């Protein structure tokens, strides 16, 4: 039997029935990812397996480094085939890491390759995959069609012109591609060398002059309006933790003015400015019926040496352990008091916070929007089988699992769509075990619609995207 077979990860007859009946054929709504919209607009055709699979993949780079592979074959200038060979030699060493599952699931689904990837099979895999990539079968557009992706939400800076999204909308592509408003740089008053060039770009994008806090906020709103006009209905924030030391408008303006003059905000000032801006962003989202996403808890760029050499997002990040409950509860409560709490999805990176988040979301359900505040799917280091189960169990135990928005790729790679399949198999295995243990009724009419909703329906209804 092939390693990746029809019943992969499905440990019971009931799980297999649930998956093949209710989950397998559901479309995909990838409501948070990092796909380059330029690649979609250009209908990129990938030259080889390296380009589509290893280019920019920090998950693989971390594994390769741990296997003794030099940086030249991760992010460096080694030839593409040599980098691929270094990965192929690494794969057998990743046993019990989710990379081993993902690698073989992706080879099977994209190229029909059944054999295990290792040093001995690498040349055959390279040749077979590249032969498919040389045809029109796996261009960016064809991949989205192949995996029945109804919509993709990219992650975009407020200063982005969204020209690629406009081109995609005009192309006739069946998959809708929407922007997501990610204004992280708007908080960087503690780093004027980053903040001020960004504000300068914001001036250009908003076609306005920015010298005061009021003008800054007006420019932010103009860009938020533009994203809305382009079909965007989600925002996203990558922050260590929520901010809750709310300053006055005057104090926020003072911190902004000093940053514009090149004076770095202190840690306390940064926290206050961030708290002020996160309220601004929450109000904007609520006014337009958007969904706010909070990605909490990543400790980034741990290796100063490697960050200086290679920059961000190259594989030097890990799980942080900041306290989350107090500031998060205070932030959500402040918006709720103003009747300005938008639909919200909270993703935590530290599994120690699972029950914190699973219980926190119950404090702010409004009795109008089902599942208004959501515990997001396992993120980054937690988007693997065990951590998916942890998240699902915490949400089930403390909340309304049936209203869960389900999976997203959170990926830069066009090869990541089988992660939705992976999630769905884990989901159906969970329900199957419960049924076979007598903990849930063996009733397809009861459980089947819940599985379908978690796979697609809940997200489709909740997010308000024009899909």
Curated annotation (Swiss-Prot):
Belongs to the metallo-dependent hydrolases superfamily. Uronate isomerase family. GO terms for molecular function: glucuronate isomerase activity. This is Uronate isomerase. Pfam families: UxaC. It comes from the Bacteria. It catalyses: D-glucuronate = D-fructuronate; aldehydo-D-galacturonate = keto-D-tagaturonate. Pathway: Carbohydrate metabolism; pentose and glucuronate interconversion. It comes from Solibacter usitatus (strain Ellin6076). The keyword S-adenosyl-L-methionine does not apply. Coiled coil: none annotated. Keywords: Isomerase. Its EC number is 5.3.1.12.
